[in-house]
Amino acid sequence: MPVLVLQIFLVTIPFFALVAAGYVAARSRVLPLEAIPGLNAFVLFFALPCMLYRFGANTPIAQLLDGSVALVWGLCALLTVGAVVAFSRNERIGWNDAAFGALVAAFPNTGFMGVPLLTAILGVQAAGPVIITIIFDMVLTSSLCIALSRLDAAGSHGAAQAMRKALAGVLRNPMPWAILLGALASAASYKLPGPVDRTIAMLGDAASPAALFTIGAVLARSAMLAHQARGRAPVRDVLPVVLVKLVAHPLLVCAVAWLARAFGLPLGTPAMVALVLVAALPSASNVSMLAERFGADNGRIARIILWTTVAAFFSFPLVVGQASG
């Protein structure tokens, strides 16, 4: 096991090193803060959709439509959201901050970090389960938490309106469309014309380093702006959510997946391992931007994301070692 964990550390070091490079570049202003939205836009609208299209097109359609994966992941996401909202709400933390704390606990950084990292560790067979988790979290988990965040201000009517706006935002996001087009290409065994395929391949190859560098830059920007706006969030409001994300969430996914298999759900071992490793990823960096947009305590959210990203450098290889053992 120690040798295996060391080997996994050696695989993951370049991924986290790119995140650290982006953080240092933004923190030192070598990368101007004003340039980060443009870098993020390149990853979100060009490089990452091309990478996801290629994974979708090269993954058997049966893996992309695996209901067992969706059921296990969805149940764990809902349980995590419910638990974090329940224990977070108090006289200082209302629905808005509790909902975004729940989102940052249940939503791993699957798109920017998980796809390249897990395919490097598990191979291309991990792409199907990972893509399913991306779709579920982007469409349902995010929309649910945004709806819950509005309960403070406008009750159930405001929550329903917020959910509709969140779903409209999903439709404007190119990532689900790239996955859908890739799935259709897989189902139809369609191959793109040579020049188009090479162009998409070049953009897709740029996705991994650009996305990881962008994570670090976004974390640095969010931390700096949030600290200027509200000061530093107290540890008691940050650490429990970090522990949920990196410890409770993977354990919950492992337990639910094991129970699902025990009750006869056709969940393969590779898919189960992929789900546990997705849950062990740090929090999604884009939650910070959502929290800022909806007026939540972005200082707290940014700190949770930063802590999970730093801690995952040590915790993630351990989870991989246990899951692969």
Where are these regions (language model features)?
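Alpha-helical transmembrane segments of multi-pass small-molecule/ion transporters
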Residues: M1-G325
